[in-house]
């Protein structure tokens, strides 16, 4: 199995290291030519969604990636990656792929000082530590979206 990690901005190295510890081959996507490689999944990392979207368009990567996602490429998205996938962003203009039927709110947990740690259950996995650093909040999900974890208010 080979997983591509979007590596134009954000926390891509952390995702690569985690996948490599699991024995998964990774490839970095930095330019349009990198999309010509074969890969079985995609990671859209945390970072700054506005910057990532702009860079993907400037590097001519946006449309080819969107097409792969629409064709069914499995995607793991964290933070900014989730914002890129969301069909709706309630407190900002939509700049992403709009392929996941969710509505998110950017920076919903406030400023950097409002960051927090939470241990919660993930369906099929168990208790897992989670960090929320200016993270997006999922306000609503489409009928076909399965919720795997929720943070208690």
Regions found by a protein language model. Give the residues of each.
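N-terminal beta1-alpha1 cap of cysteine-dependent amidohydrolase-like domains
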Residues: 1-58, 63-68
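Short low-complexity stretches enriched in small and charged residues
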Residues: 1-9, 32-36, 54-55, 84-91, ...
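Solvent-exposed alpha-helices and their adjacent loops that cap or buttress functional pockets
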Residues: 34-36, 67-68, 76, 122-125, ...
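Cysteine-nucleophile active-site neighborhood
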Residues: 49-120
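Amide-donor transfer/coupling interface in amidating biosynthetic enzymes
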Residues: 106-153
């Amino acid at each position: 199995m080979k997983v591509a990690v979007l590596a134009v901005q954000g926390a891509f190295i952390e995702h690569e290291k985690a996948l490599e510890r699991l024995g998964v081959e990774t490839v970095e996507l930095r330019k349009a030519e990198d999309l010509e490689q074969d890969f079985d999944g995609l990671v859209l990392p945390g970072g700054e969604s506005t910057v990532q979207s702009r860079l993907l368009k400037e590097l001519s990567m946006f449309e080819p990636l969107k097409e792969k996602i629409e064709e069914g490429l499995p995607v793991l998205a964290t933070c900014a990656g989730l914002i890129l996938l969301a069909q709706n962003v309630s407190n900002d203009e939509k700049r992403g792929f709009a392929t996941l039927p969710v509505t998110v709110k950017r920076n919903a947990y406030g400023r950097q000082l409002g960051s927090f740690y939470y241990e919660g259950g993930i369906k099929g996995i168990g208790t897992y530590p989670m960090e929320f650093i200016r993270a997006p909040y999922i306000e609503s999900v489409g009928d076909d979206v399965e919720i795997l974890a929720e943070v208690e208010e």
